[in-house]
Structure formats: C-alpha cells, structure tokens
From Swiss-Prot:
InterPro entries: Elong-fact-P_C, NA-bd_OB-fold, Rib_uL2_dom2, Transl_elong_fac_P/YeiP, Transl_elong_KOW-like, Transl_elong_P/YeiP_cen, Transl_elong_P/YeiP_CS, Transl_elongation_fac_P
Organism: Pseudoalteromonas translucida (strain TAC 125)
Any GO molecular function: translation elongation factor activity
PTM entry text: May be beta-lysylated on the epsilon-amino group of Lys-34 by the combined action of EpmA and EpmB, and then hydroxylated on the C5 position of the same residue by EpmC (if this protein is present). Lysylation is critical for the stimulatory effect of EF-P on peptide-bond formation. The lysylation moiety may extend toward the peptidyltransferase center and stabilize the terminal 3-CCA end of the tRNA. Hydroxylation of the C5 position on Lys-34 may allow additional potential stabilizing hydrogen-bond interactions with the P-tRNA.
Biological classification of the source: Bacteria, Pseudomonadati, Pseudomonadota, Gammaproteobacteria, Alteromonadales
Localization: Cytoplasm
Keyword Protein biosynthesis found: yes
GO biological process: peptide biosynthetic process
Protein's name according to its UniProt entry: Elongation factor P
Length: 188
C-alpha cells in the first residue's frame, strides 16, 4: 500500500497504526518558534474504536491502510448480523454488531451505506448522512408550551431517540442527521 507524508494528512485518511487500520479524525500542523514543525493528529482505530493523539515530525511518512470503502444496500438483520448487498454484483456481506456500532439505530431497509472492508471483512458501517424516519412515540406538544428548551424527546421507527420541536407529532416523518443524531426538518 502507498505511504503518506505528513503534508498529505487530512480528516478521513486511512492509515496503518500499530498493525491496525485507523482513520485520521483531525490533523493540526504546528510550527513552533524554535525547532522543527510537527503534526498533531487525532486517530481512531477502526477495529477497536480507540481514539488516540499522536505527533509526527514534519516530513515523516506513514503506511496507508489497505482498506476499501464500498457502497452497499442494507437488506435485513437476523438478530446477530446485519446483511448488506452490492447493487451491481448482488454479492451479500454480513456485518456484526462490533462493525456496526451506533449505525444500527439509523438503518432502514434499502438505504445505501458505506462499508469499510479490511481483508474482505467489514470493520466499519457508516449510514447515510441523512435519513428519513417516522416518529412512533412522543409527548403531545401543547400550544404555548415554550417555556423550556423548545424540544421534546421522540422515539423513531428504528428505536432511536432524538430531540424534536414541540410541533412535531406521532406518525410524522422527519429528517435526521446521523452524524450527530439531531433533528433537521419535517419531510413533506
């Protein structure tokens, strides 16, 4: 696999760290008044999920991770595995709960997810950035009840719980940002 120099570091770049594929979360170039410049990098290990901070000297190189990101459609779950299918080749891949992480609460059948494969095995499942889900349970919003924060918890069809505005009712479909789990808008 290719080697990456510190000047090629950016968020989302996949590298090998301690024999495990990792993803760069944040990269900060530091040029002190005295001494050599360096990069302060936050890295998430893709298999263990650990986040660590590491410094690299300017010009140092790191081995790139031999991982492959593929877009696959979510099919179903059998309780132990979540099954995905490649829409071109119709090849199916099963991901376990460890690879899925928090993505499970955002998955809707036939949604296209990005799956990171390492040695042919799924290690990370990334749901679409925005999903449209139906509200199955929430408190009724009372007119004029805006003294608080202006929000209320709502349970969605997948079981996820998000804060929504008071005017949103049971049965409505809302758009949710899966990266931070926040309400975006109602779907007309």
């Amino acid at each position: 696999m290719a080697n990456y120099s510190t000047n090629e570091f950016k968020g989302g770049l996949k590298i090998m760290m301690d024999g495990e594929p990792s993803s760069i979360i944040e990269n900060e170039m530091v040029k002190p008044g005295k001494g050599q410049a360096f990069n302060r990098v936050r890295i998430r290990k893709l298999i263990s999920g650990k986040v660590l901070e590491k410094t690299f000297k300017s010009g140092e190189s790191v081995e790139g991770a031999d991982v492959m990101d593929t877009d696959l459609a979510y099919l179903y779950t059998d309780g132990e595995f979540w099954h995905f299918m490649n829409n071109e080749t119709f090849e199916q891949i099963a991901a376990d709960e460890k690879a899925l992480g928090d993505a499970g609460k955002w998955l809707v059948e036939n949604d296209v997810c990005t799956i990171t494969l390492w040695n042919g095995n799924p290690i990370v499942v990334t749901p679409p950035n925005f999903v449209e889900l139906e509200i199955t349970e929430t408190d009724p919003g009372l007119k004029g009840d805006t003294a608080g924060t202006g929000g209320k918890p709502a349970t969605l069809s997948t079981g996820a719980v998000v804060r929504v505005p008071l005017f949103v009712q049971i049965g409505e479909v809302i758009k949710v940002d899966t990266r931070n789990g926040e309400y975006v808008s109602r779907v007309k």
